[in-house]
């Protein structure tokens, strides 16, 4: 199948993938698992080969979570800034893994740190993606009290993405954690209102609200299932879709 054929079989032109920091831990309790990072990078490379424009937001919970630091007595804003720096570390690790697979990648940080990455500039990020480069947005929104889920929704809207994908540890949204509740119900499709009304642990309310106000579909899938990202691009496999109306 040629690259053009692959493009014709995908549903989306430009997408944002949100990956939690915890997803990069693999079976570790802390930090980065290089095999897991490599596997996710390969899945991203496969989607780039389909000529889909890809950007990413990566969390930092595998290294530091601001809200946990605040719970331990640390100033919340200070703790959140530490969490933002953790996302930069994860972004650099993913950039390295992608470039080893021949995927041109740029990291843009909402907190300028010119020695290691570019500052976040919306139009520059768009140009990178138009040229087939992956762009990883680091440091969240650059402001404390906002999660990386909110940053993902914000960047997806700014980049005019067709869909926001959240790669998680399970294959969609459930009524309860399926790893703890055997009979948890899996949803194939939900509305933004249902997610908020049922208090489902998908994304925080701010992220859902941004998506809803801008008619941005959200797809939740298992980031650890090999090839799942590419399958979702073709409308295949198991996932949950969140939209305005079912």
From Swiss-Prot:
Molecular functions per Gene Ontology: ATP binding; UMP kinase activity
Subcellular location: Cytoplasm
Statement: the UniProt record of this protein carries the keyword Cytoplasm: yes
Organism domain of life: Bacteria
Regulation: Inhibited by UTP.
EC number: 2.7.4.22
SUPFAM superfamilies with a match to the protein in the record: Carbamate kinase-like (SSF53633)
GO biological-process terms attached to the record: 'de novo' CTP biosynthetic process; UDP biosynthetic process
Catalytic activity: UMP + ATP = UDP + ADP
Annotated metabolic or biological route of this protein: Pyrimidine metabolism; CTP biosynthesis via de novo pathway; UDP from UMP (UMPK route): step 1/1
Entry binding sites for ATP: 18-21, 61, 65, 168-169, 174, 177
Keywords: ATP-binding, Cytoplasm, Kinase, Nucleotide-binding, Pyrimidine biosynthesis, Transferase
GO cellular component: cytosol
Residues binding UMP, per UniProt: 60, 80, 141-148
Pfam family, one: AA_kinase
CDD domains given in the database record: AAK_UMPK-PyrH-Ec
InterPro entries: AceGlu_kinase-like_sf, Asp/Glu/Uridylate_kinase, Uridylate_kinase, Uridylate_kinase_bac
Function, as annotated: Catalyzes the reversible phosphorylation of UMP to UDP.
Similarity remark: Belongs to the UMP kinase family.
Subunit structure: Homohexamer.
Name the UniProt record assigns to this protein: Uridylate kinase
Organism: Acidiphilium cryptum (strain JF-5)
Phylogenetic classification of the source organism: Bacteria, Pseudomonadati, Pseudomonadota, Alphaproteobacteria, Acetobacterales
């Amino acid at each position: 199948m040629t690259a053009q054929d692959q493009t014709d079989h995908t549903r989306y032109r430009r997408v944002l993938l949100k990956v939690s920091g915890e997803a990069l831990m693999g079976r570790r309790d802390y930090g980065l698992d290089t095999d897991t990072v490599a596997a996710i990078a390969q899945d991203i490379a496969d989607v780039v080969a389909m000529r889909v424009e890809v950007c990413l937001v990566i969390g930092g919970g595998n290294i530091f979570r601001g809200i946990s630091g605040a719970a331990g007595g640390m100033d919340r804003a200070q703790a959140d800034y530490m969490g933002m720096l953790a996302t930069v570390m994860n972004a650099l690790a993913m950039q390295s893994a992608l470039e080893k697979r021949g995927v041109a990648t740029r990291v843009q940080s909402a907190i300028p740190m010119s020695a290691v990455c570019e500052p976040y500039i919306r139009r520059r990020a768009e140009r990178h993606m138009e040229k087939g480069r992956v762009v990883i947005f680091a440091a969240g929104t650059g402001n404390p009290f906002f999660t990386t889920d909110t940053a993902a929704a914000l960047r997806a809207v700014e980049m005019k993405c067709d869909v926001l994908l959240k790669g998680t540890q399970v294959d969609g949204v459930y009524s309860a954690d399926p790893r703890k509740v055997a009979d948890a119900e899996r949803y194939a499709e939900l509305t933004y209102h249902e997610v908020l009304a049922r208090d489902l642990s998908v994304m925080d309310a701010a992220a859902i609200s941004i998506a809803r106000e801008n008619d941005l579909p959200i797809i939740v899938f298992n980031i650890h299932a090999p090839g799942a990202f590419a399958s979702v691009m073709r409308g295949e496999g198991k996932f949950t879709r969140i939209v305005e109306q079912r």
